[in-house]
């Protein structure tokens, strides 16, 4: 592969709409494959175990994609979030507070709705956690495809909201479904992060230190029994974003420029390929609106996430606790709140954990189908709303441009 071709390919993959398109194509392929006559080959490949057993890394291909490749995406997300917190949209404390408040609303309200509807149903004593998570990769992918004319502050809000949301989901998974956390491995991960932060402070730049250190951090986090993607977010947030005198670009900008094409072109699509294959059947689809588990998931995601994110955000802004993102209206924020209902992969994971061993296994399957259908519905509704808001923003910009021209008509 020639250098000019590599450069052009990298530039192409950095385009948000391209990354979003590849992600959704991979998800569609997985869904078709998992429900085709050769579906056995999909599940056999996804469940194939590979890796050194001695290091407790004899994981399935699907787990490698979810815990390994997705950690790269979370690292890039951490870099973006750190930049916005230090020098960008979230440098204003009240604007930084809004996605945190919104994420809390987006966890609490769905949990209450799911617990209320599913009360007394076997498995729902922990199954209420299924609709609390937002799938950051898919939500940002849909936004990239359908919200290109929305102000960039929309991506910042959704990114920061989804990161906080996923961190809360990871805490819930640790509390509800992890029998014990290996404290020594957790301390090892914290020590690795401390070394990384110290190296950043001392302006050390060699990848010979950072690559092994990042891998060791991921390994310690994994063996501690905590979702290993957390290592990616933590490393991203510890990376320096301000340039020193004489520096052409900061370490965060340099790393994001190099890793973003890998994340968008390889890591996220492969993750989507192995995470999106849900087997559908007419029997399961027929129970979708009658089974209390699926009712809990659908209402929790579609209603709970939207109302929780938007309602708490609206209240915080009205009370002066937080500030609205720049150039965004409440209608924009409502559309973004609908995208928050794309639970997808994290919700599928929680469904597996919460409903494993309950009944004949159909409970987990109906929950997964509910997650899939609801996430697709949220994607379509959110896309339609974003498209309408994009047209409104474009029309407003055109009107503004006309007014600035000589002889333009004032409003």
UniProtKB/Swiss-Prot annotation:
It is found in: Cell membrane. The chain crosses the membrane at residues 18-38, 59-79, 97-117, 127-147, 167-187, 218-238, 261-281, 297-317, 338-358, 366-386. It catalyses: Na(+)(in) + 2 H(+)(out) = Na(+)(out) + 2 H(+)(in). One of its GO terms (molecular function) is sodium:proton antiporter activity. One of its GO terms (biological process) is regulation of pH. Keywords: Antiport, Cell membrane, Ion transport, Membrane, Sodium, Sodium transport, Transmembrane, Transmembrane helix, Transport. HAMAP family: NhaA (MF_01844). This is Na(+)/H(+) antiporter NhaA 2.
């Amino acid at each position: 592969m020639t250098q000019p071709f590599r450069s052009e390919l990298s530039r192409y993959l950095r385009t948000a709409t391209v990354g979003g398109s590849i992600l959704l194509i991979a998800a569609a392929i997985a869904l078709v494959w998992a429900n085709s006559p050769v579906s056995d080959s999909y599940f056999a490949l996804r469940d194939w175990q590979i890796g050194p057993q001695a290091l407790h890394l004899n994981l399935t291909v699907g787990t490698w994609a979810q815990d390994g490749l997705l950690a790269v995406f979370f690292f890039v997300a951490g870099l973006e979030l750190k930049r916005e917190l230090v020098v960008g949209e979230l440098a204003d404390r009240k604007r930084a507070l809004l996605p945190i408040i919104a994420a809390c609303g987006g966890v609490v309200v769905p949990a209450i709705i799911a617990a209320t509807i599913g009360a007394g149903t076997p498995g729902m004593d922990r199954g209420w956690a299924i609709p609390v998570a937002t799938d950051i990769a898919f939500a940002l992918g849909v936004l990239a495809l359908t919200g290109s004319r929305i102000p960039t502050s929309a991506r910042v809000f959704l990114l920061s909201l989804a990161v906080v949301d996923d961190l809360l989901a990871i805490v819930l998974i640790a509390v509800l479904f992890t029998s014990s956390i290996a404290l020594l491995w957790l301390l090892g991960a914290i020590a690795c992060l401390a070394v990384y932060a110290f190296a950043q402070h001392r302006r050390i730049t060699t990848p010979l230190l950072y690559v092994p250190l990042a891998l060791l951090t991921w390994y310690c986090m994994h063996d501690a029994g905590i979702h290993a993607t957390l290592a990616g977010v933590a490393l991203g947030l510890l990376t320096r974003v301000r340039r020193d005198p004489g520096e052409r670009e900061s370490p965060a900008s340099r790393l994001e420029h190099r890793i973003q094409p890998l994340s968008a072109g390889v890591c996220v699509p492969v993750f989507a390929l192995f995470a999106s294959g849900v087997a559908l059947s007419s029997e399961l689809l027929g129970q979708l609106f009658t089974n209390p588990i699926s009712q809990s998931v659908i209402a929790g995601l579609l209603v709970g996430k939207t109302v929780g994110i938007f309602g708490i955000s609206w209240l915080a802004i009205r009370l002066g606790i937080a500030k609205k993102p720049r150039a965004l209206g409440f209608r924009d924020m409502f559309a973004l709140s609908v995208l928050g209902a794309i639970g997808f992969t994290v919700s599928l994971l929680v469904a597996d954990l919460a409903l494993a061993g309950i009944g004949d296994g159909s409970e987990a399957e109906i929950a997964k189908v509910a997650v899939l259908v609801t996430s697709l519905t949220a994607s379509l509704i959110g896309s339609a709303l974003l498209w309408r808001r994009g047209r409104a923003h474009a029309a407003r910009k055109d009107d503004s441009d006309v007014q600035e021209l000589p002889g333009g008509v004032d409003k």
